[in-house]
Every structure is written in C-alpha cells, then in structure tokens.
C-alpha cells in the first residue's frame, strides 16, 4: 500500500467521523519537549511556542508525517491562572504553529483547553468559565477547526468547559483523565460520558494518566453508559504511551517513576498496533495518544489501520510492516525476526536485573 497525501478540500471533524473515517490524533508534547529541553517539569506550561517555536513546529511535523490528521494546539495549562500575562500570546502562537503544519497535509487544527489549577480549591464556576472563555476567544480569532477540552479529573469542571466551548459554532470534543473507577468524585465513566454529551459534546472519551489497556476499559464503560441512556456520540481515546497497570485512581502521576523514570514502561510500536486495533473494534474512530506517545507510536496506529484508511503515512516509507525490513539483514537470527508472529509475541526485557515488574503507587 503506497503512502498518499490525500489532496483536496479538507472535511471537518464531524464529517469525517460520521462517514466512519478513522481520525488519528497526535501524541506527547509536554513529556517529549521536556526530554528535549524545551519544557520545565513541574510547571508543565507551553512557553516553548514562543521561546522555541522551531522545536514545537518540528514535533508537529513529526506527528503529521507519522499519520496524525489533527494538529492540536500546544496550549495545555495555557490559561491565565497558570501563565498570567503571557497566556494570550502563548495561545495565539500555538494556533499559528498548528495551522502552519496542518496546512502541509490533510490535518485539522484543534484548539485545546484543560482543567484549571483552581477547581480543586475553589469551585468558582464563573471564574473558571471566564478562564475557558478567554482561550476560546483566541481560538475563534485564529479560526481553529474544532475544540478539545482534555485532561479533566472532575466531570463537573469538564461540563463547564463544554458549556463554554459550545458558545462557539465549532464542534466540541472532551476527554477525561480517568480510569474505570471514574472521576475524583466517584462518578462512573458511563455517567461522565452521559453528562458530557448532554452538555453538548459531540465527541467524548479519555486521555492521559492511564495506559492503552486501562483506557480502553474505561472507553468500554463510557460506551455502555451512552447506550444505556440512549445517547449517541463519537468516541475518542488518547492514552499514555506507557504501561501503567499498577497505578491507582489518579493514574501514572502517583507512580514513583513519574515523571523522570518512565522509560522502562514505554509501549512498543507493536503494543500500539494492538491498541489501535482494539480501539477500532470497540467502535472508537478518533484514536491518538498523550504523554509518552511518540511519533513512531502514531505511525503504528496509522499502519495498523491502513486497510481501513486506504493509505499509509509518509513515515512508513522507511518502515517495513511488522519488521519486514529485517529480511535484508546479514545475520540469519535477525532475519528470522522479520515476521509479525515474532514481534507480536515478544515480551521485552528491561535489561535491569533488579528492576521490579510493577511499582507501588505513592498515593
């Protein structure tokens, strides 16, 4: 199957999803740019769009080449409560970078907001909605294609975000950073999905905090909740690029390896192909990743779902399906690995003789 660029007028996000098309999101920005030296851990704010625009542009380009057809603005935690006077310039610059790269392929631009830093301490609906509305005004000015409210651990705040984003004429997606146990107020994933759709979201799901397997379990519960309530919405999943089956209700942030010792937990490209297929079989059509999800992980989604999409991404020009490029290797035992069965059944070692398989969460 040859790579293709899909020329022509771009369809909107809902038009794509309603036709059954697979939409591939992007992946990790904060964790990846921290590793590359452009984001400060702890603050996790996106000044890099102004201070190091080439680094952000390059990462967008890598995701586009890997198969992403959504360029999400790098505006995580870019609200006034986190960035004070810099918030407006950061949001505007992030939109410009995402639009520039999206224009090089069949990609849409999504303006992204996330949970605020003040909800846990002061549930001031008017103040929180004002913060969301400020970012929305920039997204409208920059004419993003649709909107994403992501990384919400409380459904009440996520509903407030959806209500604000619905003030625009753009489609709204919302993802919560919850596992099968539900949000931090013990509201089930199914009930969370119902409340979000009733608030006006067209696309619902989960992102971050949990690995692919756990995130798909949560998606199944969301889907069941919507079906039981007689509601319809498109489903979206963007998990970690890490394995974290041992984390607690708060997700990987409670693991002792977070954030600087997660490398031994990185999912392989083959893990991600399995995740992509399982997500598709569950009925999810917006499939991407979050923290730890590198461009090669996105390529794995695009390759696994190439039969459904009808084309491969440009990055597949240098990548043989299921290791097929290894059949040219000079060593016979490496040539023997040029097959799906080998990689699909491999249980990778960590190389650390005293490394435990699982950790005990700190919280």
Curated annotation (Swiss-Prot):
GO CC annotations on file: cytosol; extracellular exosome
Reactions catalysed according to its record: S-methyl-L-methionine + L-homocysteine = 2 L-methionine + H(+)
UniProt keyword annotations, A-Z: Metal-binding, Methyltransferase, Phosphoprotein, Transferase, Zinc
UniProt cross-references to InterPro entries, sorted A to Z: Betaine-hCys_S-MeTrfase_BHMT, BHMT, HCY_dom, HCY_dom_sf
EC number: 2.1.1.10
Highest rank taxon of the organism: Eukaryota
Tissue note: Expressed in liver and kidney and at reduced levels in the brain, heart, and skeletal muscle.
Cofactor binding annotation: Binds 1 zinc ion per subunit.
Cofactor names: Zn(2+)
Domain Hcy-binding: 11-305
Pathway annotation: Amino-acid biosynthesis; L-methionine biosynthesis via de novo pathway; L-methionine from L-homocysteine (BhmT route): step 1/1
PANTHER family in alphabetical order: BETAINE--HOMOCYSTEINE S-METHYLTRANSFERASE 1, S-METHYLMETHIONINE--HOMOCYSTEINE S-METHYLTRANSFERASE BHMT2
Subunit structure: Homotetramer. May interact with PRNP.
Function description: Involved in the regulation of homocysteine metabolism. Converts homocysteine to methionine using S-methylmethionine (SMM) as a methyl donor.
Record protein name field: S-methylmethionine--homocysteine S-methyltransferase BHMT2
